Amino acid sequence: SYSSFLAPAAALTDYLETRPIASNLVSRFDRQFLMLEATALSYMISSSQHDIDFLMKIVDDLSQEKYPHDIEGGFLRAERHARKVLSVVKSIEDSIRVGKNLAYVQINSELPSSMVVNFVLGASGKPVALVYKTKEDINSCIISIRGSNECKVHLGRIVNNLSSTLSGSGGGHEKACGAVIPKEKFSEFISFRNDRCLDSQ
């Protein structure tokens, strides 16, 4: 039924599809269909952060049990957004810095860092990838972090502890998390050398 679509779609885009309940829900759908619909919906939402009318249209259409492919103009927005993401990814390829287990890079784009970080994870071949952007009005770094299956630590817990130590805030899931820390603390965040360090598995 349609009511069982949104939960597994959300689980896929939030990296929770391996959890017991989510895994059971995901298994009820053709995986390719679910991935296409979930990703397209995520891109529609991400590309429309400053378009409240279209965001409300998404809500209205979903409330009428329409699938993302039925949202008029939605797939076109998702396609344009995908092109924008890929353009940013190509622009930073040569700037990625690599440590023992961690790859990281700064972006200067209107795109949220969370839209780019998985590309860095794949391109670097490292267990953990980090993408950040600076926000001058609050003198902070906005950080997104992802881990591959090779990552053997709980990133959300590490980032929560580390960012709190550095007068920031953060946390999240085992393989996907984020943080906001003072800009002057970023180097310390990267190089922290103890059991909470991202680059010392």
For the regions a language model picked out, list residue spans one by one.
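Glycine-rich, acidic loop segments that terminate in or are immediately followed by a histidine
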Residues: N101-Q201
